[in-house]
From Swiss-Prot:
This is K(+)/H(+) antiporter 1. The keyword Ion transport applies. Residues 33-39, 102-115, 168-179, 236-253, 298-322, 386-388, 879-889 are cytoplasmic. It comes from the Eukaryota. It holds the Pfam family Na_H_Exchanger. The lineage of its organism: Eukaryota, Fungi, Dikarya, Ascomycota, Taphrinomycotina. Gene3D superfamilies: 1.20.1530.20.
């Protein structure tokens, strides 16, 4: 308990050797808060936190705040550095233990050729460059040590690469899954191991005083390494098995024994004359990597190390840094020269190794810029050099400045050179709507599913099941295109070391991941070909990675499946069905996650589809009304008598009815809301693939401006089959595609109207011509099961859909074999669909609709959001045309 108290008028921050805790707490709060504040602006530049911690230490030191009178005397007095250094060095030992666990020797073995080549080049050449510049830097020392020892230390500092910082930069730039990232990661591990060996050798030679003593120290260090790897490593594995730490979470006893080993190893390496951090590093390398054991251990200690211990260490380092000692032109000349030599030697050597590996110049430059990263490990080396007396304050400050600059420029340099790498999806685009019409019939032959969450996999399996049912029940004489299922699994990683460890073991993880294996088994049981990719991505900005993966797989369409939450939908009645809150409830977590993926949807150069589903069980379907007409009072009725009278003109609709008054229930009902946009064509193509099954039926609701002022009519008063739309009386289709005339037969119009009298009623607008063309390509069997319904406003559309889909029956049903899937296109501000939205928006607001300000709401548009909220329990497919599509008709 503290003997100082504010009630006694004591200065509680005065250092007391018997009770140093109060001042230590004040120091820790100031250091951590300042480092976090500095990191906020640097994070927007994608800079690692270590730069903020180094700068924070420099700011607290004599360079900046040390110039405030009495600041260092009261807050960081020399006498208080003992406890601060003790805690920070303990944290450093634990941090090196974590770094040791990052070193997966299996990666070195699998990529030994690449690792050996890049590691040797990236160490030998910078080592030689450091030896050259050390001749000039030696003049700034007191020359208490031999030049050879000084040369060895400077060369080690020049040749080392900060592997922990490097791994985080690779994660931020989404390079971990690429060949460039694999090469740099492997070389970084090799560089890290050799760098620590060189550092141990340097410290040994400095502390030995004689060559014979140095040999003894090295032999003891080698013996300790062999003892750990030969005797202790198998025992650690057996202990992990015995305590069930491999199968489950690491037990408390296992963690206690491992941390005790870290301290013992650090103690031994310190007393033999190397450094305690080397002992912690060695213990980290012997921890088994099976079943993510290193990840689980790291998760237990990394937050304490990264949030408390490391900032204290770098702050104590910054307190020793005095940039004001760089006060002459000659010193600044050597400082700039040191920075240039450090970057040029590291970058040039790594680039040369990459060129030997036959990598392109652009990728070679990326490898070189990444390997020039210094940062955290450099600071450790410099502090050891300062504590041993090899470096004085001037050279120490010079190299700290060099470490900050080289680490700071790593990310911008890498991003700059990445611009010159060939974009693998630049050519993956469709340039015009005419090209899309030709492209669509073959579109869904290779379906790519983006799976970010386990629930997404369930939704993808439901979509695949829909396709399988159609293929499985189709007539044997009908030729179907081969369908390949391609899944893209994303593994999100952040700056946490445990996540980076998990990412580095992704290949092993993919092979053993139960969900991925289950998904693959499901696809193969359905007799589809299967391909998959696992991507290591950070939380944001990974869209280019996905797009490049799509290009490599030659995908025709990207489908993003989402599983909606039934529990939230049950509570929907508490709010307006058109309110934004109801829409959020209908989509569940998909609403938020879709907002994060909007840039991917907008940037895609191939069609994109968003599939919403609730659960694998199908829904009840009300008895289908093949003809829905409107009476003069606006109420709907089934006009089977009129159907019989007009049987001659509506013989294609007759297939939907077995006999007068009967109901013929289809096993699958698919609905398309067609507003004449390119996005709707994407939805149309997927709808047609759902019609291979002979017992399925489709309703295509088309918007026609002719009815936009007909608000008195609650239901559409015109229903046509596709054959009517493709009749020769459709002047626009006849003029644009004369060949269609051969496949079209004359149809007499209903209700006694002559052709001339009724032609203005059923001629679709220009936006429907692509629909006509696509429907003319399908088989007679499919076309006969398509009914086209016109509507003039959103109210009439909703009324018709409510008649088709009975709201009271929208509950989970395990007995029916029926399902409903609705297909829509995203909003298109340049299309006629925008007019429908504008006309309906004011009316929707009166009914309680709150215009969505979300990214997804703006992209999807009013119509899909309203339909999603009105029919939350049916499946939805929302289509989006490629980015470079030329809009217009």
């Amino acid at each position: 308990m503290s003997t100082q108290s504010i009630f006694d008028g004591d200065n509680v921050v005065v250092y007391s050797a018997s009770d140093p805790l109060l001042l230590f707490i004040v120091q820790a709060i100031i250091i951590i808060a300042l480092c976090r504040l500095i990191h906020i602006p640097l994070s927007f530049l994608q800079q690692p936190r270590v730069i903020a911690e180094i700068i924070g230490g420099i700011v607290l030191g004599p360079t900046v705040m040390g110039r405030i009178p009495k600041f260092l005397d009261y807050i960081f007095p020399t006498s208080s550095m003992g406890p601060l250094n003790l805690v920070s060095n303990l944290g450093l030992v634990l941090f090196l233990f974590v770094i040791g666990m990052e070193v997966d020797l299996r990666v070195l073995v699998l990529n030994y050729k690449v690792t050996l080549l890049v590691t040797v080049f990236s160490i030998v050449i910078p080592f030689g460059a450091g030896a050259g510049i050390s001749a000039g830097l030696y003049k700034f020392t007191t020359r208490e040590f031999e030049f050879g020892k000084f040369l060895l230390f400077i060369s080690t500092a020049m040749s080392i690469t900060a592997f922990p910082v490097l791994a985080r930069i690779l994660s931020e730039l989404h390079l971990l899954h690429k060949r460039v990232g694999v090469i740099v990661l492997s070389a970084g591990i090799g560089n890290d191991v050799i760098g620590w060996i060189l550092l141990a050798l340097s410290v040994t030679l400095v502390n030995s005083g004689s060559g014979v003593r140095a040999v003894y120290i090295l032999l003891l260090a080698l013996g300790w390494c062999l003892f750990l790897f030969i005797a202790i490593k198998p025992l650690v594995y057996l202990l992990a098995v015995k305590t069930r730490s491999l199968k489950d979470k690491p037990s408390e006893s296992f963690i206690c024994i491992v941390l005790s080993m870290v301290l013992v190893s650090a103690f031994f390496t310190d007393i033999i004359g190397i450094h305690p951090i080397f002992g912690g590093f060695l213990v980290g390398t012997i921890i088994p990597h099976e079943n993510d054991l290193t990840v689980k251990i790291t998760e237990k200690i990394e937050d304490l190390v990264n949030c408390l211990f490391l900032p204290l260490y770098f702050a104590s380092s910054g307190l020793k840094t005095n940039i004001s000692t760089l006060n002459t032109g000659k010193i600044w000349g050597y400082t700039i020269g040191t920075i240039c030599v450090a970057i040029a030697s590291k970058m040039g050597s790594s680039m040369l190794a990459a060129r030997i590996l036959k990598m392109p110049w652009s990728d070679s430059l990326v490898v070189g810029s990444l390997m020039s990263c210094k940062g955290l490990v450099e600071l450790i080396v410099l502090n050891i050099g300062l504590s041993t007396g090899i470096l004085n304050e001037t050279i120490f400050s010079m190299f700290v400045f060099m470490a900050v600059i080289t680490t700071f420029v790593t990310t911008p340099m890498t991003k700059f050179f990445l611009r010159f790498t060939k974009s693998e999806h630049d050519d993956n685009s469709i340039e015009s709507s005419e090209e899309l019409v030709q492209y669509l019939p073959e579109l869904p032959t290779r379906l790519s599913f983006l799976i970010n969450h386990p629930l997404d996999a369930s939704a993808a399996m439901i979509f695949i099941q829909h396709i399988y049912e159609n293929r499985d029940k189709v007539s044997g004489c009908l030729h179907l295109p081969q369908i390949i299922i391609h899944s893209i699994w994303t593994l999100f990683v952040d700056s946490r070391t445990s996540n980076l460890l998990r990412a580095s073991q992704v290949d092993n993880k993919v092979e053993n991941e139960a969900l991925m294996g289950l998904f693959e088994t499901f696809v193969k049981i359905k007799k589809f070909e299967y391909e998959s990719n696992a991507l290591l991505v950070s939380g944001t900005g990974y869209y280019n990675v996905v797009l490049e993966t799509l290009k490599k797989s030659s995908s025709n369409i990207l489908i993003m499946p989402y599983l909606k939450d039934y529990k939230t939908i049950e509570n929907e009645s508490s709010s307006s069905p058109l309110s934004l809150s109801s829409i959020r409830l209908a989509l569940g977590d998909s609403f938020k996650s879709l907002d994060e993926l909007i840039p991917l949807i907008k940037m895609a150069r191939i069609p994109v589809g968003v599939f919403f589903t609730r659960n694998p069980h199908n829904l009840s379907v009300k008895k289908i009304r093949p003809i829905i007409r409107s009476t003069e009072y606006g109420s709907p009725k089934n006009d089977f008598e009129q159907l019989e009278k007009d049987k001659k003109s509506f013989d294609q609709v007759e297939i939907s009815v077995k006999e007068k008054g009967s109901t013929y229930e289809r096993s699958k009902v698919v609905i398309l809301i067609y507003l004449g946009t390119e996005n709707d064509l994407i939805a149309l193509e997927l709808l047609l693939k759902f019609l291979y099954e002979e017992t399925s039926i489709a309703y295509i609701y088309t918007y026609d401006e002719f009815y936009k002022d007909d608000y008195a009519t609650s239901l559409p008063n015109v229903v046509y089959t596709s054959e009517v739309l493709l009749s020769k009386h459709n002047d626009s289709a006849f003029k644009v595609w004369p060949k269609l005339r051969k496949n079209i037969r004359k149809i007499t119009k209903p209700n006694g109207f002559t052709t001339d009298q009724h032609s203005q009623t059923f001629i679709p607008s220009q936006t429907h011509t692509k629909l006509d063309l696509r429907l003319s390509d399908v088989t007679d069997s499919v076309r006969s099961r398509i009914n086209v319904v016109k509507f003039g406003n959103l109210n009439s559309l909703l009324s018709c859909l409510h008649e088709l889909i009975q709201p009271a029956t929208l509950t989970p049903s395990f007995e029916t074999e029926k399902s409903i899937t609705m297909f829509l296109g995203c909003r298109d501000k340049q299309a006629v669909s925008e007019k429908l939205e504008v006309a309906a928006l004011s009316e929707m607001k009166k009914l309680g609709y709150i215009e969505s300000s979300s990214e997804f709401g703006m992209l999807a548009g009013l119509i899909p959001l309203v339909l999603l909220s009105n029919f939350p329990l049916i499946d939805f497919f929302l289509g989006k045309a490629p980015t470079k599509m030329v809009q217009g008709y």
